């Protein structure tokens, strides 16, 4: 897409003076500034106006543009001015914040503010995560200094109001811009935005008003928490500032793996090894669950991969929406290190059965054969 003529963009003639260019730019930039104009395409027009002004307000760039237009043989006016300049060192965004009142409001440094949140990682056993528990944790956190009551000043003294900002925590900074002089507000570097100067600092906290301590906190872990979930403990974060509320503590859970169980949501999965005889003849076996051992009937002819479900033997939903199930997957164990007698028995079994698979296995092998024959 070809660029429009810069003079056309600003609506001025090629003989326009600097003042005329500046006046046109101020009018158009106010019209299309994104903080003022919410119409579609206003942002692009604003960038176009800004780019045109950057080119025509500089004598050297204007002369090059008048000679070469947009196709500059030097690949841009001394490094380019395609909307990315900073207007010679003054903050463009600050200018419009001052003009249009769209800047971020500075907070009152003496206003109450909530303390910072804290995070603590807790490692749980598989069982503790499933059933929940009450425990005590110890966390390092900042607390208000008891000696100075959080003021940072030596007992018997008070912080002075900052003489540079008058206690506001902000300074007015005057800048020269294309629109004239603009006043911006900055954080006072003398008091670091607090509005106060502490001349006689508390010896215990060094003037910060805070001290590091280890705090013991009772935590109730709900049943059913899972790895990566977190628990919010209100009011147990860092203390507030200027009488504001304390932050919160977030306890993040890491659940250790179990040697027998695996978890998927509220359901539990485990593998049950069976001997060849148990799988072939059937049996009644004891299955471990989180809630104790239960008896499970294994029907004759059970194959590897067969699944059984124990309803209600999983994990309680952490939000109270019922209970999960336990899923048992059978794995038939092939015997190894057989004695001579055992080998003879298996050979005899093979001879009696004719070394042929049963009906279920026959149907499977038939399907394989048909697949190879292309049937």
Swiss-Prot record:
PANTHER family: CHAPERONE PROTEIN DNAJ, DNAJ HOMOLOG 1, MITOCHONDRIAL-RELATED. The J domain is necessary and sufficient to stimulate DnaK ATPase activity. Zinc center 1 plays an important role in the autonomous, DnaK-independent chaperone activity of DnaJ. Zinc center 2 is essential for interaction with DnaK and for DnaJ activity. Binds 2 Zn(2+) ions per monomer. Residues 5-69 form the J domain. One of its GO terms (biological process) is DNA replication. GO terms for cellular component: cytoplasm. GO terms for molecular function: ATP binding; heat shock protein binding; unfolded protein binding; zinc ion binding. Signal peptide: none annotated. Homodimer. Zn(2+) 1 binds at residues 145, 148, 202, 205. It is found in: Cytoplasm. CXXCXGXG motif repeats lie at residues 145-152, 162-169, 188-195, 202-209. Participates actively in the response to hyperosmotic and heat shock by preventing the aggregation of stress-denatured proteins and by disaggregating proteins, also in an autonomous, DnaK-independent fashion. Unfolded proteins bind initially to DnaJ; upon interaction with the DnaJ-bound protein, DnaK hydrolyzes its bound ATP, resulting in the formation of a stable complex. GrpE releases ADP from DnaK; ATP binding to DnaK triggers the release of the substrate protein, thus completing the reaction cycle. A zinc finger (CR-type) spans 132-214. NCBIfam families: DnaJ_bact, PRK10767.1, PRK14276.1, PRK14280.1. This is Chaperone protein DnaJ. It comes from the Bacteria.
């Amino acid at each position: 897409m070809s660029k429009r003529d810069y003079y056309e963009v600003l609506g001025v003639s090629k003989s326009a003076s600097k003042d005329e260019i500046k006046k046109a730019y101020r009018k158009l930039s106010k019209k299309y500034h994104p903080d003022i104009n919410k119409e579609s395409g206003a942002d692009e027009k604003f960038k176009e106006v800004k780019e045109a002004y950057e080119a025509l307000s500089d004598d050297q760039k204007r002369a090059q543009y008048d000679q070469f237009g947009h196709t500059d043989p030097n690949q841009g006016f001394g490094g380019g001015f395609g909307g990315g300049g900073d207007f010679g060192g003054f903050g463009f965004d600050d200018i419009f914040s001052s003009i249009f009142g769209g800047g971020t409001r500075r907070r009152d440094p003496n206003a109450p503010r909530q303390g910072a949140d804290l995070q603590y990682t807790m490692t749980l056993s598989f069982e503790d995560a499933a059933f929940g528990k009450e425990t005590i944790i110890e966390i390092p956190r900042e607390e208000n200094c008891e000696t100075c009551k959080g003021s940072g000043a030596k007992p018997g003294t008070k912080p002075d109001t900052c003489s540079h900002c008058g206690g506001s925590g902000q300074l007015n900074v005057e800048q020269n811009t294309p629109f004239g002089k603009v006043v911006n507000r900055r954080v006072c570097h003398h008091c670091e935005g607090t509005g106060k100067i502490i001349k006689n600092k508390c010896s215990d906290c060094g003037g910060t008003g805070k001290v590091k301590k280890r705090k013991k906190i009772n935590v109730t872990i709900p049943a059913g928490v899972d790895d990566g979930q977190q628990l919010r403990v209100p009011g147990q974060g860092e203390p507030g500032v200027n009488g504001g509320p304390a932050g919160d503590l977030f306890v993040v859970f890491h659940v250790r793996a179990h040697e027998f169980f695996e978890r998927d949501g509220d359901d539990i999965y485990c593998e049950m090894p069976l001997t060849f005889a148990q799988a072939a003849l059937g049996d009644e076996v004891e299955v471990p669950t989180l809630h104790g051992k239960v008896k499970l009937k294994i029907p004759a002819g059970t194959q590897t991969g067969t699944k059984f479900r124990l309803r209600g033997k999983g994990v309680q939903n952490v939000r109270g929406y019922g209970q999960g199930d336990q899923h048992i997957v059978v794995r038939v164990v092939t015997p190894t290190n057989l004695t001579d007698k055992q080998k003879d028995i298996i050979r005899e079994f093979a001879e009696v059965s004719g070394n042929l698979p049963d009906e279920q296995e026959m149907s499977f092998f038939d399907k394989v054969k048909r697949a190879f024959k292309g049937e």
